[in-house]
Amino acid sequence: MFSWIKGKEGEDKAVEYLRNSGYRILERNFRSRFGEIDIIAEDNGTIVIVEVRSKGSTGYGYPEESIDHKKVRKIIKTAQFYLLKRDIKGKQVRFDIISIVNNNIFHIKNAFDLDY
């Protein structure tokens, strides 16, 4: 349960950061049979799919290093399902990672794409 609470705190910080950066939050914790997307936002007409990872330190690596190929594929499939379900067409889609270490936020834009 502790990791779930920490994860939610990280996602809350990421949402606050994105809003302060001018993003419009469309969805949080969108789930499908393919997986889950932490945050779906819009930035100047681009749909932004955001995976949030947070840690207390980098002693065992950076948070974003825990996102493996399998997780990326799940995020992409879930994003494709989301776009289809919401009938979103003709918009650019970007995949970002927000990495949080000790309250420091690192925003990695275009972390991967549909061809990953």
Curated annotation (Swiss-Prot):
Q: Which domain of life is it from?
A: Bacteria
Q: Pfam families in the record, alphabetically?
A: UPF0102
The record, for CDD domains, names: PoNe_Nuclease (cd20736)
User: Which molecular-function annotation in GO is an example for this chain?
Assistant: nucleic acid binding
**Similarity comment: family membership:** Belongs to the UPF0102 family.
User: What name goes with this protein?
Assistant: UPF0102 protein PERMA_0362
- Whose protein is this, by species? Persephonella marina (strain DSM 14350 / EX-H1)
